[in-house]
């Protein structure tokens, strides 16, 4: 049984090149397509998994491979001044200007908020416009392209310590903030990796940096140019599928916002485009739709994620 099957996703067709494996991350091949889709659309991504599962490593490698200015913030420790620098009044005292520090966000092209589920609520509110609007203090961040975050699974209200690791300091995000992440990706743990993936992980030998840089940039560009073609191809089918899926989730007490309905449509088109780039014509639309529901529901980031059975049942009925 593959890692993808254990996590509820259909196994991907064989690809000539795996993004995550080239970056030195094993066992994430089933996440290649949503990662590529997010990079091509510059959509925010939330990675959810236990400590030590390569969440931070992957993001740092992506930033390096794409040659982007990456700002890595530990959201559990951050202060607002760490983002914006030092505020000083301008002459006359009517306006503030920000004196940048080496870690401030102003020239960032890729922002990563680690441990976002341990962040104080007031700072989560300040991260909200960065993630959703690419703004801070009301000012547009012109260079910013990618906004990613990572967290440990939130601790359920009632838990059994014998069931595994519980992260008592990790709390569910505010629903409005969670709803701003088009892709919410659970990452595999050690026991979900196949033996060969485990062996490769122990050695961890990523591809040559220059090879990855050229290949990844090319894949992102081709995926971005393929998305409009997919949108045109799915124009008549997609609205009915998304409306049916959202209604079925509502019946299952998994309520989705109108914004999320639009996000699901956009995510499906970009994810199918990514799978066409990675796997060619073998990438079936049926599987792309299934993956969209598995990897683009905000409830995946809550204390009690929806069951695989529920999500796949909605997909089949829609």
Predicted segments, located by residue:
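Residue-level recognition of beta-strand->loop/alpha-helix junctions
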Residues: 72-74
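C-terminal regulatory/interaction module of P-loop NTP-utilizing enzymes
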Residues: 1-69, 81-111, 116-132, 136-318
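Switch/coupling segment of Walker-type NTPase motor domains
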Residues: 77
């Amino acid at each position: 049984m593959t890692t993808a099957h254990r996590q509820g996703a259909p196994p991907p067709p064989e690809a000539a090149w795996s993004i995550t494996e080239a970056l030195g991350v094993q066992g994430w091949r089933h996440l290649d397509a949503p990662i590529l889709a997010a990079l091509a659309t510059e959509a925010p991504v939330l990675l959810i998994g236990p400590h030590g599962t390569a969440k931070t490593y992957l993001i740092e490698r992506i930033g390096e491979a794409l040659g982007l200015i990456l700002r890595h913030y530990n959201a559990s420790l951050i202060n607002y001044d760490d983002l914006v620098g030092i505020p000083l009044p301008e002459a006359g005292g009517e306006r503030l200007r920000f004196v940048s520090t080496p870690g401030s966000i102003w020239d960032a092209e890729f922002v990563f908020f680690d441990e976002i589920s341990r962040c104080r609520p007031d700072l989560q509110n300040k991260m909200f416009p960065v993630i959703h609007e690419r703004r801070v203090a009301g000012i547009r961040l012109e260079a910013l392209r990618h906004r990613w975050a990572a967290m440990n699974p939130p601790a359920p209200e009632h838990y059994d310590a014998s069931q595994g690791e519980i992260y008592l300091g990790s709390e569910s995000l505010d629903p409005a903030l969670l709803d701003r992440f088009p892709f919410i990706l659970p990452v595999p743990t050690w026991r979900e990796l196949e033996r060969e993936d485990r062996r490769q992980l122990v050695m961890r030998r990523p591809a040559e940096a220059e090879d990855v840089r050229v290949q990844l940039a090319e894949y992102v560009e081709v995926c971005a140019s393929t998305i409009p073609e997919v949108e045109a191809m799915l124009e008549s089918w997609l609205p009915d599928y998304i409306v049916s899926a959202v209604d079925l989730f509502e019946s299952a007490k998994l309520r989705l916002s109108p914004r999320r309905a639009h996000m699901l449509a956009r995510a499906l088109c970009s994810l199918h485009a990514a799978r066409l780039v990675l796997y060619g014509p073998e990438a079936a639309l049926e599987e792309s739709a299934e993956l969209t529901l598995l990897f683009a529901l905000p409830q995946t980031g809550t204390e009690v994620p929806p069951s695989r059975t529920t999500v796949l049942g909605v997909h089949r009925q829609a």
